[in-house]
Regions:
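Adenosine-cofactor binding site in Rossmann-like domains, unifying the SAM/SAH pocket
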Residues: 30
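FMN-binding flavodoxin-like domain, especially the glycine-rich phosphate-binding loop
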Residues: 2-7, 11-27, 39-133
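Helix-turn-helix
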Residues: 36
Length: 133
């Protein structure tokens, strides 16, 4: 049974998003089909964000970032996983993204996870963030 108030948003990392959604009983939504109504009708989000090699958000995520800025996130819980990017090059951009979400009312839950880094463990991360979603 899917928990409709939790949405896992992804771009090219669909397999990871589906694994997270299965663990949470959530639905997945492609960043390319994300819209304001989905933001308004959902309580919690897991964002599998992607960054360009030189730092900023990928173009699809830049679009969704604008959607999030245009909608109140007050009372919404957000967990952020960097599905494509690394903390050395993209860390400052990831923090800026989180700050924008906070300024718009979102409650960021858990630590930011960088997929594929040394010691990353998706199961542990999902267990850590799930009680707060």
């Amino acid at each position: 049974m899917k928990h409709e108030s939790i949405v896992v948003v992804y771009d090219s990392c669909q397999a990871i998003a589906e694994e997270i959604a299965d663990k949470l009983g959530a639905e997945t939504v492609s960043v390319q089909s994300m819209n304001i109504r989905q933001i308004e009708n959902s309580q919690s989000f897991v964002l599998a964000v992607e960054f360009q090699a030189d730092g900023p958000l990928s173009p699809h995520w830049q679009y969704v970032s604008q959607l999030f800025r245009g909608t109140s996130l007050s009372g919404k819980n957000v967990a952020v996983m960097v599905a494509l990017g690394n903390s050395l090059v993209n860390g400052i951009y990831a923090e800026a993204f989180n700050s924008e979400l906070r300024l718009n009312g979102a409650h960021i839950v858990g630590d930011q996870l960088y997929a594929g880094t040394s010691g990353w463990n998706l199961d542990n991360w999902v267990c850590a963030v799930s009680p707060n979603l």
